[in-house]
């Protein structure tokens, strides 16, 4: 088919001139939180499982190895008392989980979004696109539509709802938002990741150690970003530039890490091979992303690594020969919030830029120019996002 010059110029006129940039970041968590040291006692008490003495001790050891101090959660003891099937290991409880999360996930997303919009400082009427991600509360119309109403956005905002993605999806959201911002001149994309462990909270079972790992690891939280190209001088101040973004998965990786939505909630399967498998496959992703830039020293980058668990962080650090300061922000977020699934790496991104400003660094990326965001999850899917910092 022949393409006329005028037609081609028209297509290019619809594209932004510059690369996508993160213009603001906001985060939010539920008010209720649990202390990790005392959580084994709490968990076995609220699930009426105190008779499982040996299993409780095993859970205590698992919790102590997570390097988590506290986690925020929607599920309070009062809510669990009112909905006892949530405390069972196998009783059907999906309807109750849905009722809770369909309401709470958009509200949590709203809190983070309002913080991002406030930092951005521009009218919310100029938001053109919304990308919402959660593994919780699948519904139609979805959390994206509910958030538009909660924020009072235009009904004409272009929406994309991503359900059931998992821990890698923080990187996915940046990749999708980059494409939207760069291919739609003047676009301002609101990205929201809101997650809750309530979808998978279950009582313990001696036959299911994987469940104990999930109960020790996941927390609740939401992160929101405003992303756009060609920032308005004097009105918009970029935080990071999204230089490139790519996705891949490890062949046969789904046998190592998978989650399944069942009548008893979201079930979790994880093998001991997850940390070494991720660590072994990360460097090939880095080489593909940074070889064109002439970079092979991974310590020359600032790092946002999704903390799937402490063992993963340790093995990636060891395999790549990273200095102890490189994954400090990752460990801080894991310690203070637990694994927040898709929102987690965005919390770390926020931590990096705040720490850089607090410590008087030259740039928003620990004083360095280039960095990498790596997120991974079911599949084993890996997202690799190259970021450029901005001067502070």
UniProtKB/Swiss-Prot annotation:
Enzyme category, top tier: transferase
Keywords, comma-separated and alphabetical: Acyltransferase, Flavonoid biosynthesis, Transferase
Gene3D superfamilies: 3.40.47.10
SUPFAM superfamilies in the record: Thiolase-like (SSF53901)
Expressed in which tissues: Expressed at low level in seedlings after illumination with UV light. No expression in flowers or tissue culture.
InterPro entries: Chalcone/stilbene_synt_C (IPR012328), Chalcone/stilbene_synt_N (IPR001099), Chalcone/stilbene_synthase_AS (IPR018088), Polyketide_synthase_type-III (IPR011141), Thiolase-like (IPR016039)
Any Pfam family: Chal_sti_synt_N
Keyword Transferase carried by entry: yes
GO process terms (BP): flavonoid biosynthetic process; polyketide biosynthetic process
EC number: 2.3.1.74
Recorded metabolic or biological pathway in which this protein acts: Secondary metabolite biosynthesis; flavonoid biosynthesis
GO molecular function, a single term: naringenin-chalcone synthase activity
Keyword Transferase set for record: yes
Catalytic activities: (E)-4-coumaroyl-CoA + 3 malonyl-CoA + 3 H(+) = 2',4,4',6'-tetrahydroxychalcone + 3 CO2 + 4 CoA
Signal peptide: none
Catalytic site positions: 167
Function: The primary product of this enzyme is 4,2',4',6'-tetrahydroxychalcone (also termed naringenin-chalcone or chalcone) which can under specific conditions spontaneously isomerize into naringenin.
Family the entry assigns: Belongs to the thiolase-like superfamily. Chalcone/stilbene synthases family.
Name of protein: Chalcone synthase B
Species this protein is from: Petunia hybrida
Organism phylogeny: Eukaryota, Viridiplantae, Streptophyta, Embryophyta, Tracheophyta
Gene this chain is encoded by: CHSB
